[in-house]
């Protein structure tokens, strides 16, 4: 049996119009009778009244009543809609605590909902991820997890592994039992390979969709005065970098974040790369090379008819295995008959960069955000990758001649990882760690 908990669910901004205080537990209706002047409402009803401390009125409120177990938390819950601000909210909290509740830990309402069987960990984490979404695409991806299709997919994998494990154990412990399928190599290997294929596809889709949650680093490199800082400013639509006609103006890396089609990028405007005897400028050039190594996308900015030198070749060499985009700047100064169709031309100073933006996004298109097999949550993705590794180890073991009683260890590990994605109520340490990252009142 849980105790009674309370928290502000709407945050605690100083000047917000409304504050929502949530209570949950076995005695919350009785607590409300002590401090609320209105009627105790029926399930899913709203009543009007005042919150009082002894006979002193604290606030005029609307109270929403939710009888357990048919609500989010799965137990009696009350939500008080009070006037906003820290002072009034704090007074109401103190009054509730004085009458038999305690302050909730972060995520404790969601944790109770999980323990009461109202949601699994996939949906619980989707709620938290939705709250912390930074882009529209992130929010769309997270809300899709509410329909439980991802959970159903994981549970289907779990059930297939349960069948394999159960059959293996019967074959090991009761080899004389005739009513169960004999798991020979010819039977077990295809089943595991089918599972490997399913999980591999989920991991592949998940890795691709991570672009909407990770920051993709882009290094803008090239010679001095080719327009790198102007390009950074054009992409950001603001003046972040200093732009002059003096070569070597940028001597350190200037970083800025921007979102393009819902994808987060980290732009890095680097020092111009050339031969220099200036000690400070040489340090900046070395940093430019380092940024090429550390970035996923390299925008190599050049001018028309620019000859390739040793530094240009080094940029290309360091860009091997990365997305390399060669861009010709100052398009407005080039006659139309000299523009080639297979090249990307821009005018950074005039903000004419649409062709470059298309090139940046090219490899990140055609991702189906509705695919329920996609897993973006870091904890869940690590677990499904671990389960895939264990299944691959089991397959490898069988192909090397090991018997089912040996590889069942790897198969069981794969099952445990998948079970921990949707959640196990007996793993208290996991639950405490996960729900502690939630907001107060959630």
UniProtKB/Swiss-Prot annotation:
Listed binding positions for Mg(2+) are 229, 250
Q: Where in the cell is it found?
A: Cytoplasm
Q: Which residues bind (6S)-5-formyl-5,6,7,8-tetrahydrofolate?
A: 22, 79, 118, 442
Gene Ontology MF terms in the entry? GTP binding; GTPase activity; metal ion binding
Q: Which cofactors must be present for this protein to function? A: K(+)
Residues in TrmE-type G domain copies: 215-365
Residues holding GTP = 225-230, 244-250, 269-272
> Residues that bind K(+), according to the entry?
225, 244, 246, 249
- Supply the SUPFAM superfamilies for this chain: P-loop containing nucleoside triphosphate hydrolases
Free-text cofactor note: Binds 1 potassium ion per subunit.
The top EC class is hydrolase
Q: Which InterPro entries would you find in this protein's record?
A: G_TrmE, GTP-bd, GTP-bd_TrmE_N, GTPase_MnmE, MnmE_dom2, MnmE_helical, P-loop_NTPase, Small_GTP-bd
Q: Where does the UniProt entry say this protein principally localizes?
A: cytoplasm
- Tell me its EC number(s), please: 3.6.-.-
Q: Which family is annotated?
A: Belongs to the TRAFAC class TrmE-Era-EngA-EngB-Septin-like GTPase superfamily. TrmE GTPase family.
Q: What does this protein do?
A: Exhibits a very high intrinsic GTPase hydrolysis rate. Involved in the addition of a carboxymethylaminomethyl (cmnm) group at the wobble position (U34) of certain tRNAs, forming tRNA-cmnm(5)s(2)U34.
| Assembly and interaction partners | Homodimer. Heterotetramer of two MnmE and two MnmG subunits.
What protein is this chain from? tRNA modification GTPase MnmE
Q: Record the organism.
A: Mycoplasmopsis pulmonis (strain UAB CTIP) (Mycoplasma pulmonis)
